[in-house]
Amino acid sequence: MSESAFAERIVHNLLDTDFYKLTMMQGVLHNYPDADVEWEFRCRNGEDLRPYLGEIRNQLERLGDLTLDDGQLAFLERISFLKPDFLRFLRLFRFNLRYVHVGIENDQLFLRLKGPWLHVILFEVPLLAIISEVRNRNLHPHMRLAEARDQLYRKFDWLRAHASDDELAELQVADFGTRRRFSSRVQEEVVRVLRDDFPGRFVGTSNVDLAWKLDIKPLGTMAHEWIMAHQQLGPRLIDSQIAALDCWVREYRGLLGIALTDCITMDAFLGDFDLYFAKLFDGLRHDSGEPVAWAEKAIAHYQKLGIDPMTKTLVFSDGLNLTRSLEIFRALRGRINVSFGIGTNLTCDIPGVAPMSIVLKMTDCNGAPVAKISDEAAKTQCRDENFVAYMRHVFKVPSKE
């Protein structure tokens, strides 16, 4: 019988998070160490998570004793753009549980984060992973690693049957599956199998711990929170995306050059993504809306600015599987470079298992609301309808309701 899919402890170390959390955390340390933020948890499909509150609290409390050890620190020191002062700070960092509020409210599990951005930023990914795994081990207590592994090999067989050798040589796929994974053990097994046997090009993982353990590349640049926070960090709202991109450029000097486009909408983003940014950033990340139509806008924008699209890369990360990735790859091949970050479909695709639809999103920065509109109406998120309406007015975004 194969090994259980579950470990007693869900999050084992500080690096069991997405790489862009560390890159943004460094940016916060250097630029906004005094910013205060609030976050709220949402279960999009209304699943009743109240029975798991005790187990979630138990795993949450165990985050408080996590520290960075010498081996993990040595791994991070090899990443040139992580600066010595940030690594010293991370060596001293501890999760402060007084910034986390969890309980039952309105007959639902509620979870809120409130505190300094610098000290709250690392909570998101492990908290979501904890909620997902606690739920899964209650619903599927006898799940074995072999079931996840067998499902992944079936996907490899499908890909070999449907893609040519030339296509496989160019098809770049990464693991972006930490936050809604079935379990930590399943994600590690999936990433190990991808590294060893993926028929295309496996280019890395967003999970820093697995990158360290399995000797592969950690991947990620920025998340929505980086751009959202700038809506309340000082500049005029109309200049907030420009301020976010400009701060990133000053922090990383041309490295980590994949920009996220859908905090407001792709059209609003391209209005701010001028020749300066288009030359400095290596490419763009898609996270909502129809992917090929989005890519056509990106290609046209680069061409309008006199930039060869084949010098740039588009990263796709919105609810992908291998089938959809191959379709997008074929639609854009030879016109612009593409790469695919696949999450839940790699780390929580097991027969008989329904993945969770959960998010933990920033709602406020420095006491005022922030918003994500996105290129997909269902992904719009803000606690203040008036602020969303104001943002739509400022950026000339029509309402999709």
Swiss-Prot record:
Presence of keyword Nucleotide-binding: no
Cysteines joined through disulfide linkages: none
Class of this enzyme: ligase
Post-translational modification: Transiently phosphorylated on a His residue during the reaction cycle. Phosphorylation strongly increases the affinity for substrates and increases the rate of nicotinate D-ribonucleotide production. Dephosphorylation regenerates the low-affinity form of the enzyme, leading to product release.
GO cellular component: cytosol
Signal peptide stretch: none
One biological process term in Gene Ontology: NAD biosynthetic process via the salvage pathway
Protein keywords: Ligase, Phosphoprotein, Pyridine nucleotide biosynthesis
GO molecular function, one term: nicotinate phosphoribosyltransferase activity
Catalytic activity: nicotinate + 5-phospho-alpha-D-ribose 1-diphosphate + ATP + H2O = nicotinate beta-D-ribonucleotide + ADP + phosphate + diphosphate
Classification via Pfam families: NAPRTase, NAPRTase_N
EC number(s) per entry: 6.3.4.21
Pathway assignment: Cofactor biosynthesis; NAD(+) biosynthesis; nicotinate D-ribonucleotide from nicotinate: step 1/1
Modified residues (Phosphohistidine): H224
Top-level taxon in the UniProt lineage: Bacteria
Keyword Phosphoprotein in record: yes
Alphabetical list of InterPro entries matching this protein: N/Namide_PRibTrfase (IPR041525), NAPRTase_N (IPR040727), Nic_PRibTrfase (IPR006406), Nic_PRibTrfase-Fam (IPR007229), Nicotinate_pribotase-like_C (IPR036068)
Biological role: Catalyzes the synthesis of beta-nicotinate D-ribonucleotide from nicotinate and 5-phospho-D-ribose 1-phosphate at the expense of ATP.
Family: Belongs to the NAPRTase family.
Name the UniProt record assigns to this protein: Nicotinate phosphoribosyltransferase
Gene coding for it: pncB
